[in-house]
Amino acid sequence: MENGSLFNASEIGDLVKAFSNSLAKAPSVTTANGLNFLPLEEEARNTYPVFHPVLDMIPRVTPEELGHEVGGLTATWKQILTPGGNVLPSVPEGSRNAYINIPTRTTSANYVTLGVDAAVTFESQSAGVGFNDNLGTANLAKLNVLLNLEERMSIFGNSGNASTGNNGFLLAVTNTPTLTLKTGGSIPGATNVSVFLVALTGWGVYNAQNFGANLTAPGIAQQISYTSADGNTVTLAGGTAKISLASNVVTATGGTLAVEVKVAAKPGTFGYAVYIDVTDSTTPLAANAYFAGVYTTSKFIISSIPAAVSGMTSQAASALGNVDYSANPATANTTGDFDGVTTWLAGSTGGLKPAYVVDLAGATFTSDGAGGVAELEAAISNQWNTYQVTPDAILISSDLVPAFQTAMQSSPSGSGAGTLWIRQGTPDNPAMGGSLIQEYKCKFSAFGLSKVLPIRNIPWLPSNTLLAPTFNNPYPAAGDSIPSNFRMVCREGYYGLKFPYISRVHSMGIYVEETLECYVPWAGILLTSVGDLGVA
């Protein structure tokens, strides 16, 4: 003991050294141990889109006869077409005119059942207590999924049943494309290029993005097949036409060329699956053509060869069956599609009274010099001059919003050119960028009054598409017998079911039985393959 200490100097040195060494080692507890407060918000957030503006524009009705609700397999109605086409008004003195003809047509639309199912295990429900109502989440999710799918069906559902009033169509064989070399690409020199095309309906474009992309070799899904909650096999057509014949072969030189693809469009086509062959120099083979993507205009540019084509890793054209899957009629394991708004218009082109269905082949909107869009003005004038009808709304795909707005706010060069300046009307007049076009004035109406058409962006409308339907009665003076041009006839409105327990799973579904009526299918405008601002 030194100076009254319990430890001598040597022992104190050893203690200090040992203590210092312990401080240099890793601490016992850090944030990596996970002993931290978890600031989890009190509920899960629904971070997915739900849009159904077209559904909201169409009235929903229950089928009735003499004031009583009725069922049946179809909604059927008679159309009285233009009477009196066989006479003129002048009659001889003291005589009479010929009897007028009154042509009619019978139209029907099959009821279909749409539905979505969901399941929640008992453990999931009990484990979510205090955080999230998992049953409630599943119920809301299936309703939202049904609304999104029903919206798409209302736009481009296709029964293919053209024999009952031109409601529905089949695309059959895709027309043969033609190729032309263009400058401005990066296709390697001495590359032989040919293509095969598959025309796609609205469902075809959607399915290529959502099912075809998940194939082992990405491409298009000609059929969608899965097992239902009750063990049945559901098989639906993928919205695809038969594949085209091969195009001509072009040979790139110099490494700075691109290939322009053109094909004659068929009504009801919203896109094309493209298969590129860079192997054959004379006679292209489907076995050497590989999926290169989906284009939504009938004229487009291939500026480079995708890696999936040169690497032969995407779907080969030879993998496709030579079958037309462009329509979804009722079959043994599905009630099929009802015909959507665009299908009623496209289907009418096969009859005596066609709607205005025009493919612009990649051409962009142009200004008419008076605040209007020339292509839309031509369509509206045609509808009025031919049938004395006008649209009730302008519905455009998301990609066309800038192009449509630019055309409205631009003027062509020359004496009629003009510039419009708009600024915010506040005392200091700050500059504000951006603009929003919400309405479009129609030059025609049934009563000679000003008619203003709302402009709506429709998220589920296929790209490069403008739809201007007539939703209301276009002929109110003709006896007012048309309640609305389009009506959703609901044999059974939305109903939810919770199924008996066969395991410790809550099983439930939501369904609706309905069909879409159209009394005047020639009243409407459908412009496809409209070039956006990025299309030359």
Where are these regions (language model features)?
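Short acidic, glycine/Ser/Thr-rich loop/turn "cap" segments at secondary-structure junctions
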Residues: L114-T137, S154-G160
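Stable alpha-helical elements in mature extracytoplasmic
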Residues: L135-A138, L146, L376
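Sequence/fold signature of self-assembling virion shell proteins
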Residues: E2-F51, S126, D133, A308-V389, ...
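Short, compositionally biased low-complexity segments
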Residues: T104-F122, T342-L352
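Sec-exported extracytoplasmic/periplasmic mature domains
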Residues: L143-E151
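Disordered, low-complexity "stalk" and linker segments at domain junctions of extracellular
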Residues: G160-L352
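Assembly/oligomerization interface modules of large self-assembling protein complexes
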Residues: N33-D117
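Hydrophobic alpha-helical segments involved in membrane association or supramolecular assembly
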Residues: T47, F51-W77, L140, N144, ...
